[in-house]
Amino acid sequence: HYKNNMYTTVIDGEDYAIKPMNCPGGMLVYASEPHSYRDLPLRVGELGLVHRHELSGALHGLFRVRCFTQDDAHIFMTREQMESEIQNVVRLFDEVYNVFGLKYTVELSTMPEDHIGTVEEWEANQEILKKAITGMGKDFVVNEGDGAFYGPKLDFHIEDCLGRTWQCGTIQLDSQLPERFNLEYTGEDGQKHRPVMIHRVVFGSIERFIGVITEHFAGAFPLWLTPVQVKVLPVTDRAHEYAKGLTQKLVDAGIRAEDDCRSEKLGYKIREAQMQKIPYMLVVGDRDMENGTVSVRTRKGEDLGAMTMDAFLSKCLSEIASKSKDI
């Protein structure tokens, strides 16, 4: 099913391939030791690097690449646990996407022509996905024939600030690969049973999600997310040591801060920091050194005036802890 998109080679007469998906590894982790019904649900997560030979014309920045990182998890469970586990994953999606202020729509992707397993199994699993998502009061649309080859799935399409949608999260219900890998658990009756499995990703491709949120925020990330949160800008050479001390205090408090002690005009340094979307700029001069204060500016050009370093630290740490989107 993935052969045409895989990178393969032959070494000493043996065929080798770079993995295009993480799923077989999840199967092998489960199969590495015996399991009882008491172990289930068993949730196995990883950040796995995968390679897929996409056509060159389909490649698009961070959005479509040939090597990317998936935040994969494989959840092994009994049939009785399927609905609650699906809903647990949806709650995880809500928690993560809400942090970024992202809305989503849901698609139920059904059995493709090129599938494994019986029609009856597919229909039963599709009904479980429907029941789980509607039981949470969420709407969905049906995407006929777009399921994975091993099972139906719920696809979560997040919407960016331009109204574009990107498929990121997915919940794939799979009773086929546990069969192919001969996975088992010992039931309450002492007999061997076959588990069922969920494949889930929240971000999908980490690289693509970074691209999505970069465009969504137009580079002006919330304070908690931005790579450099504070830039300290001394007005004169006399304030360099004071600026460096402030920067170190910020770093010691866990804030990502830098100072700009170049011999450039203050206006130039402020404009450059604004272009870099730095949330806060601390302008420090002779008066600030005398009073032990900092003059605070935002990337939007707002002048918040002078405040003590402790007051500014408290403000920053509060915004970071709350994951505030306002800056």
Identify the meaning behind each predicted range.
Residues 1-327:
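NTP/phosphate- and nucleic-acid-binding module
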